[in-house]
């Protein structure tokens, strides 16, 4: 029988529940060991129980008391930035690695197609944000061709897809995404904006990426972006370019550098969710959980092969 790594998910909200269903359906080398929440009436805990997953509504302490905790080899945290600091401290004492889906960013930022391999052995990795997972690959693709002086992303998500955790973390979202645009995407300066779109019926997740780089070949930049999109599609099938990449050779004022001539690149993206738990318009959740699943599968495969 093939050995699998048992995982626990802390957080029975939208992200945690969607991730659980992905693990149950497409886990590969990982399997569910526990679903953890703090609301006994949450739909996520109810679904987990119906699907035969051990559950607790007593948070981290409840997880530690579960008979099967000793077999848990990896924990996903889909709660909040503040809660993750507490969870990480306790689980680090017990030697249990974590994948952090909050903006806490205790560990390194990880975007699977950009730097997943480099951090495969880390004990705590951070999945940035939904906007970061969607847009940082594009910034990195431009960075592979030319020096990126500035990158700005605008993530527009359906208001209905934003649960209480997302709403509570708006400030952390912008700060974490901005830092990761620089640290992972390779931009010298990054900025992130999130928009909760109240439109009805809800619209798909849309992301706009602007970069200003050193002069470069438009065809090389476009080819790099298209190759990166294909890599992301390997684990997020609903990820696509909304239209062809747009370019403008222009001159802008950069802080400390004066007027600089370069290439402005504009990329419009759409992320359609897989509808494992929430509707297709919740691509913002799908890309986070899909990226986290990809990282967990890579870590599990490495551990099992060791």
From Swiss-Prot:
It comes from the Bacteria. It catalyses: acetaldehyde + NAD(+) + CoA = acetyl-CoA + NADH + H(+). NAD(+) binds at residues 12-15, 161-169, 284. InterPro entries: Acetaldehyde_dehydrogenase, Acetylaldehyde_DH_C, NAD(P)-bd_dom_sf, Semialdehyde_DH_NAD-bd. Its EC number is 1.2.1.10. Keywords: Aromatic hydrocarbons catabolism, NAD, Oxidoreductase, Plasmid. It is an enzyme of class 1 (oxidoreductase). The active site is at 130 (acyl-thioester intermediate). Belongs to the acetaldehyde dehydrogenase family. This is Acetaldehyde dehydrogenase. It comes from Ralstonia nicotianae (strain ATCC BAA-1114 / GMI1000).
């Amino acid at each position: 029988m093939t050995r699998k790594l048992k995982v626990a998910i802390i957080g029975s909200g939208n992200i945690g529940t969607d991730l659980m269903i992905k693990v149950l359906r497409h886990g590969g080398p990982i399997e569910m060991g526990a679903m953890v929440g703090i609301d006994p009436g949450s739909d996520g805990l109810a679904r987990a129980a119906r699907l035969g997953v051990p559950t607790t509504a007593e948070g981290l302490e409840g997880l530690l008391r579960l008979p099967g905790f000793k077999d848990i080899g990896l924990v996903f945290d889909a709660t909040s930035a503040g809660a993750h600091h507490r969870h990480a401290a306790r689980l680090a004492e017990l030697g249990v690695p974590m994948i952090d889906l909050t903006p806490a960013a205790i560990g390194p930022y990880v975007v699977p197609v950009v730097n997943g391999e480099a951090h495969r052995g880390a004990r705590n990795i951070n999945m940035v944000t939904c906007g970061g997972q969607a847009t940082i690959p594009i910034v990195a693709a431009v960075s592979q061709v030319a020096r990126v002086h500035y990158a700005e992303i605008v993530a527009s998500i359906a208001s209905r897809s934003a649960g209480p955790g997302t709403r509570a973390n708006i400030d952390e979202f912008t700060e974490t995404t901005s830092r990761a645009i620089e640290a992972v995407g390779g931009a010298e300066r990054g900025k992130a904006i999130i928009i909760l779109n109240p439109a009805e019926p809800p619209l798909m997740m849309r992301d706009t990426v602007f970069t200003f780089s050193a002069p470069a070949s438009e065809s090389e930049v476009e080819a790099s972006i298209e190759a990166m999109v294909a890599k992301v599609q390997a684990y997020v099938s609903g990820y696509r370019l909304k239209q062809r990449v747009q370019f403008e050779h222009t001159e802008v004022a950069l802080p400390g550098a004066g007027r600089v001539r370069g290439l402005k690149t504009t990329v419009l993206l759409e992320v359609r969710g897989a509808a494992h738990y929430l509707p297709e318009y919740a691509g913002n959740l799908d890309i986070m959980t899909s990226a986290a699943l990809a990282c967990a599968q890579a870590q599990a495969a490495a551990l099992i092969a060791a």
